[in-house]
C-alpha cells in the first residue's frame, strides 16, 4: 500500500512495500508545469539522494537506473514507486492549492439593509469628521489625524493610483497597533497581512492577487531585502521576473508577472527605511506623548473593568467595512489641479506634488455618494469632480506631512532639536556642550554627539568656543526656524486655496 505522510510540508514522506522516500524541502505549489524535488530514497538501510524534475522523462530514467544500482533493487519496482509517488505529490499539490484558495476571504454579499446603512454613512454631512469619530468608537485610541489619514490612504487602494504610508516610531510606541486597528476597518477580502517577506516571495503571488489590495507589512525593518521589488510594484504597478524552465525536453525562458496597483502600509523604527522610500510613501510619526500614554492606559483599564461595549465596536467596524465595499472604482477629475502649488522646499517636489494631488483625489473618491456623476461625452467614461472642500480637507490633513517633507533634518533629529530648544529656553541657557546636554536631557552621549553633528553640518548650530573640558560649546542659530517653516507652508497652502476660491467665484 502506498501512503504519503503530509504532516511536515518541508519533509513529506512516501512509503510503499519496498521503499521509503523523503521529499526534502517539500514541493512548490505555485506551478503545475513542473515537479522539482529532492529525494532521499531508502531500502534496507541503503540510502540514495537525488534532485530532479519528476516531469522530465530523461531525469526520471537516470534516477531509476542509478537508484537501482545503489539500492540493489529492481528497476521495475523503483519505476512503480516513482510513478506512484508522482501521483501522490500531484494530488497533494492540488489539495494544498484548493485549501489555500478556500482560505482566501471571499467577497461578501451585502443585504439590502446593509447597503442602505452603508450608503447613509457615505452620504453623511461632514463625512470625514463623522468617519473619524466612528474610527475612534471602533477602538482606535487617540492618533486623531493619523488614523483618518491612514484610513483615506487605505481607501485609495480602489483607485488607479493608490497611496502608501509608513508609520515610524520607537519600539513599543504602537505603530503596529495603529496599522492593525485601522486595517480592521477595511474588508478582509481587500487586505493581506505579510509577516515574512523576501525578495523572491513577491513572485509567488498570482498575477492579479495583489491588484487593488491593501498590503500590510508589520516590520519593514526585517524586510529590507524585499524593498526593491516592493518599490517597483509601487512605482510601476507590476513586477516581472524571468527564469529558465527545464521541465521539458528543451529549456525555455519563462516570464512571471505580478500586477498591481497595490496600497502598501508598513512600520519601521529605522530612519533609513523611510529615507529610501520617502518619495513613494507618506510618513506619519506615532504619538509618543504622555497624554497618549494616559489615553491608552485609561482605555485598558476600561476594558479590564468591562466598561467597553465590544458589540458596538464590532457593529461600527462592520459598517465601515461595508461602506468600503460599496465604493465604486470611479475616475476622479480635479478641475482646480493646475492652480495648486506646493512649497518649493519640499523633498522630491515632483513626487510630493503627485502625492498631494492623488490624496485630494482620494478624499473626493471617498465622497463619491455626495458628488454628481458626470460622463465624458467622447469616451463615455463616468467620473466625479473634486470640490474646494476636498482641497481644504487635504491641506488640513497633510500640513504636518508636508512639513516633514520640507525639513532638512531627519525626523529623530528634529524631535531632539525641538526638545533641546524648549529645555534651553526654560533654563535660560544660551551655550552648551555635548556632556552638559547628555546629562540634562538624560540621553546617551553618543546620541547627543550624533545629533549635534547633524545640526552643525546643516547650520542649525554654531560653535561658540572651545570647551574647557575638551570639545566645543554650541549655540543655536535660530529658535524660530521651525515655526517660520510651518507658517510658510500654511501661508502657501492658504494662498493656493484662495486662488481656487477666487476662480470659483469668477465662474
Model-derived regions: residue spans:
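AAA+ P-loop NTPase catalytic core
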Residues: 90-147, 160-165, 377-435, 440
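Short hinge/gating elements
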Residues: 113-118, 130-137, 163-168, 212-215, ...
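Terminal-proximal interaction/regulatory segments of ATP-powered molecular machines
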Residues: 408-507
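Phosphate-sensing "switch" segment of ASCE/P-loop ATPases
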Residues: 255-262, 270-418, 422
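Short, hydrophobic-biased segments on the C-terminal half of alpha helices
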Residues: 183, 357, 452-453
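N-terminal nucleic-acid engagement/recognition segments and initiation subdomains in replication
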Residues: 1-159, 506-507
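Conserved ASCE/P-loop NTPase catalytic core
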Residues: 139, 148, 153-312, 321-326
Amino acid at each position: 500500500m502506498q501512503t504519503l505522510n503530509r504532516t511536515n510540508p518541508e519533509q513529506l514522506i512516501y512509503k510503499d512495500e519496498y521503499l521509503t522516500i523523503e521529499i526534502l524541502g517539500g514541493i512548490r505549489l505555485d506551478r503545475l508545469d513542473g515537479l522539482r524535488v529532492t529525494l532521499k530514497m531508502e531500502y534496507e538501510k541503503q540510502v540514495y539522494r537525488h534532485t530532479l524534475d519528476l516531469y522530465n522523462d530523461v531525469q526520471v530514467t537516470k534516477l531509476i537506473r542509478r537508484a537501482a544500482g545503489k539500492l540493489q533493487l529492481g528497476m521495475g519496482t523503483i519505476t512503480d514507486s516513482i510513478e506512484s509517488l508522482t501521483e501522490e505529490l500531484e494530488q497533494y499539490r492540488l489539495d494544498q492549492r484548493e485549501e489555500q484558495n478556500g482560505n482566501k476571504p471571499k467577497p461578501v454579499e451585502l443585504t439590502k439593509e446593509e447597503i442602505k446603512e452603508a450608503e447613509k454613512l457615505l452620504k453623511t454631512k461632514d463625512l470625514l469628521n463623522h468617519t473619524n469619530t466612528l474610527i475612534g468608537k471602533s477602538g482606535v485610541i487617540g492618533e486623531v489625524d493619523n488614523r483618518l489619514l491612514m484610513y483615506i490612504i487605505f481607501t485609495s487602494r480602489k483607485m488607479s493610483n493608490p497611496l502608501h504610508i509608513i508609520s515610524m516610531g520607537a519600539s513599543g510606541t504602537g505603530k503596529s497597533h495603529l496599522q492593525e486597528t485601522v486595517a480592521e476597518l477595511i474588508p478582509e477580502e481587500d487586505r493581506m497581512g505579510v509577516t515574512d517577506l523576501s525578495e523572491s516571495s513577491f513572485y509567488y503571488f498570482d498575477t492579479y492577487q495583489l491588484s487593488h489590495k491593501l498590503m500590510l507589512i508589520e516590520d519593514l525593518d526585517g524586510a529590507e531585502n524585499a524593498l526593491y521589488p516592493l518599490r517597483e510594484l509601487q512605482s510601476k504597478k507590476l513586477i516581472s521576473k524571468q527564469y529558465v524552465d527545464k521541465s521539458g525536453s528543451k529549456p525555455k525562458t519563462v516570464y512571471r508577472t505580478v500586477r498591481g496597483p497595490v496600497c502598501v502600509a508598513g512600520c519601521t523604527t529605522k530612519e533609513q527605511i523611510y529615507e529610501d522610500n520617502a518619495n513613494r510613501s507618506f510618513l506619519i510619526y506615532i504619538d509618543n506623548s504622555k497624554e497618549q500614554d494616559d489615553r491608552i492606559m485609561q482605555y485598558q483599564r476600561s476594558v479590564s473593568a468591562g466598561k467597553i461595549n465590544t458589540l458596538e465596536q464590532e457593529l461600527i467596524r462592520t459598517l465601515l467595512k461595508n461602506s468600503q465595499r460599496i465604493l465604486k472604482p470611479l475616475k476622479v477629475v480635479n478641475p482646480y489641479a493646475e492652480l495648486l502649488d506646493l512649497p518649493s522646499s519640499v523633498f522630491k517636489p515632483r513626487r510630493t506634488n503627485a502625492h498631494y494631488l492623488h490624496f485630494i483625489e482620494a478624499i473626493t473618491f471617498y465622497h463619491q455618494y455626495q458628488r454628481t456623476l458626470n460622463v465624458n461625452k467622447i469616451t463615455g467614461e463616468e467620473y466625479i469632480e473634486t470640490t474646494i472642500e476636498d482641497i481644504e480637507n487635504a491641506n488640513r490633513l497633510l500640513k504636518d506631512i508636508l512639513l516633514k517633507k520640507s525639513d532638512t533634518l531627519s525626523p529623530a533629529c528634529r524631535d531632539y532639536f525641538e526638545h533641546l530648544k524648549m529645555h534651553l529656553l526654560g533654563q535660560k541657557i544660551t551655550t552648551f556642550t555635548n556632556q552638559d546636554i547628555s546629562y540634562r536631557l538624560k540621553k546617551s552621549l553618543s546620541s547627543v554627539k550624533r545629533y549635534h553633528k547633524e545640526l552643525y553640518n546643516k547650520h542649525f548650530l554654531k560653535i561658540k568656543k572651545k570647551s574647557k573640558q575638551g570639545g566645543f560649546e554650541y549655540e543655536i542659530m535660530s529658535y524660530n526656524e521651525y515655526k517660520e517653516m510651518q507658517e510658510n507652508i500654511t501661508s502657501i497652502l492658504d494662498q493656493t486655496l484662495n486662488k481656487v476660491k477666487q476662480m470659483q467665484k469668477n465662474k
